[in-house]
Amino acid sequence: MAGESDKKGNIDDGVEIYMDFYKALQIGNWNAAKEFLNRHPHAISAKITANDQTALHVAAEAGHVHIVEELVKQMSEENLEIKDIDGYTALAQAAYYGGNCRMAECMLGKNENLIRIVTENRIPVVVALGNGHLKLARYLYLLTPLEILMPENGHMGATVVSEAIYNNALGKN
């Protein structure tokens, strides 16, 4: 049974093998995380939390750029597209929580398709805008293919404009 702590991405009994790995990722201890990966290589793409997050999700949410960069080096393009229980990729997590351009650049450098993956009816640029991460939103907007934003392809273009207006992202900066 999922408890309150599960909703916050904490470990439950089904993923207890990953407890030390999770803690290392949370606190930014790459040496401990790397040691765990050396012993358990499958953990690079495993869902290690009750919310089905991978190591990359956890590191992105915690804001540890150096760990994100190291994990991305070891992951396949497909691994970067893994979604958590809420449908978020690690890029969407970065757009939601931290707004770090280096994380986004690292992930998109390995898999350009991440810019197109929809989470809760939003592409990453909209997730960043909606959470006030304007620098990241501008970066993601520049990488977002124009066809995704065209009216004939859905509401994404209108959503980007609406979020930009709402968040005053169209200013002089």
Feature map (PLM): residue ranges:
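Conserved ankyrin/ankyrin-like repeat signature
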Residues: 32, 66-67, 102-103, 135-136, ...
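Ankyrin-repeat alpha-helix packing hotspot
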Residues: 23, 58, 93-94, 127, ...
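Start-of-repeat signature of ankyrin repeats
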Residues: 17, 52, 87, 121-122, ...
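Ankyrin repeat domain, specifically the short helix-to-loop turn at the C-terminus of the second helix
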Residues: 37-43, 70-79, 105-114, 139-148
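Ankyrin-repeat intra-repeat helix-capping/turn positions
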Residues: 28, 63, 98-99, 132, ...
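Internal amphipathic alpha-helical repeat/solenoid segments
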Residues: 2-19, 27-86
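Ankyrin-repeat boundary/linker signal
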Residues: 47-49, 83, 117-118, 150-153
